[in-house]
Swiss-Prot record:
It is found in: Cytoplasm, Cytosol. This is Putative complexin-1. Belongs to the complexin/synaphin family. Residues 23-33, 44-72 have a biased composition (Basic and acidic residues). Residues 40-71 form a coiled coil. Keywords: Coiled coil, Cytoplasm, Exocytosis, Neurotransmitter transport, Transport. CDD domains: Complexin_NTD_CPLX_I_II (cd22808). Residues 16-72 are annotated as: Disordered. GO terms for biological process: modulation of chemical synaptic transmission; regulation of synaptic vesicle fusion to presynaptic active zone membrane; synaptic vesicle exocytosis.
Amino acid sequence: MAGFLMKQMVGNQLSEVTGGLGMKDDGGEKTETGEDPEVIAARLEQEERRKEKHRKMENEREKMRQGIRDKYAIKKKEEGVAMDFTEGRIGGPRKTPEEIAAEMNAEDDSLIGQLGLTEQVEKAKTMATGAFETVKGFFPFGK
């Protein structure tokens, strides 16, 4: 640790005295990344050529795809159209919690709800569950 600190202190002072021999600022234009503008311009030009080459290749591929579609009468898939995956499913579409709640409330709209027998049905349900609990207490497998 002490050796590291000494090297840092002596190294910083030495570079100040020598003026940073490795760092030349005498007319060689450098950008903030430390590269010559010619190198940057060449890199940008190369990138543009690469992009143009890829654009041309993709256009050629699309022409080839379109030729195959025309030959075999295949329709092009639309990217913006959402696919309906429920068509080939074995089970039906899953219900959201909102749909389940709506079905529970639809019970009032059913025949029992229309006849006004909802209270009697609820009483019968509670009596049946109570009787079941009582009977279940007598049998050893119900515990």
